[in-house]
C-alpha cells in the first residue's frame, strides 16, 4: 500500500491490441512483459520507432520534417506507434506553406513532407496512429477527411488577409495592448 492505494504486480496492456491484465514477475521483466502486451514503455525506443516509421514513408525525392518538438509530442501520445501516409488536395498549396504546416503540426500532429530538390511543401502528410489497424486505408481516409477543414480554414483566413494591404493594418497596431503595464 502506498498513499492509501494498493499496488501489485499486475497491469493492463494496450487498450486495443491487448486489453487484458498482465503480470510483471520482476522489475527487470517490466518492459518485455508490456512489449508483449503491445506497449512500448521505453520512451527512447518508442521515439526511435516513430522516427524510423515516419522516415520510411517518405518516397524517393521527398524529405519528411521530423521536428524534435512534434516527435516528442507524438511519442507521448502513443503506446504502440503505427505511421501512415495520407494526402490532401494540391489546390491548398496556394496557401503559404507556413499556414498549412501549422495546421498539420499543431492541430493534427502530422509530419509534413517537402520536395528534396526545391524544398516545396508536398500535398502529403504522415500521421502516427496508436493502433496497427486491420483497415489502415480507413484510418488514412479519416485523417484526410479531418485535415480538409483545417486547411480550408487556413485558406479562408489567408484569403481574408489578402483583402487589405498590410500597411492598412499599421494604424490599428497603436491600440493593441501587448502587456497591460507596458502600454501599447
List the predicted regions and their residue ranges.
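Active-site flanking loop/helix segments enriched in acidic
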Residues: 92-99, 128-131, 167-183
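Hydrophobic/aromatic pocket-lining and membrane-interface residues
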Residues: 1, 184
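His/Asp/Glu-rich acidic catalytic environments and adjacent acidic regulatory segments
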Residues: 2-161
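Structured, charged N-terminal subsegments at the starts of enzyme catalytic cores
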Residues: 160, 166-167
Amino acid at each position: 500500500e502506498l498513499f492509501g492505494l494498493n499496488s501489485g504486480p499486475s497491469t493492463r496492456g494496450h487498450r486495443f491490441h491487448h486489453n487484458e491484465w498482465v503480470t510483471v514477475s520482476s522489475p527487470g521483466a517490466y518492459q518485455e512483459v508490456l512489449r508483449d502486451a503491445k506497449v512500448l514503455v521505453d520512451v527512447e525506443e518508442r521515439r526511435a520507432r516513430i522516427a524510423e516509421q515516419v522516415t520510411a514513408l517518405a518516397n524517393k525525392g521527398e524529405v519528411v520534417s521530423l521536428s524534435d518538438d512534434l516527435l516528442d509530442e507524438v511519442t507521448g501520445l502513443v503506446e504502440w506507434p503505427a505511421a501512415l501516409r495520407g494526402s490532401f488536395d494540391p489546390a491548398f498549396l496556394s496557401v503559404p506553406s507556413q499556414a498549412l504546416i501549422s495546421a498539420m503540426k499543431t492541430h493534427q500532429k502530422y509530419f509534413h513532407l517537402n520536395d528534396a530538390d526545391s524544398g516545396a511543401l508536398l500535398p502529403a502528410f504522415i500521421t502516427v496512429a496508436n493502433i496497427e489497424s486491420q483497415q489502415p486505408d480507413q484510418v488514412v481516409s479519416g485523417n484526410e477527411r479531418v485535415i480538409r477543414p483545417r486547411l480550408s480554414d487556413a485558406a479562408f483566413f489567408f484569403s481574408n488577409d489578402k483583402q487589405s494591404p498590410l500597411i492598412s493594418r499599421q494604424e490599428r497596431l497603436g491600440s493593441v495592448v501587448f502587456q497591460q503595464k507596458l502600454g501599447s
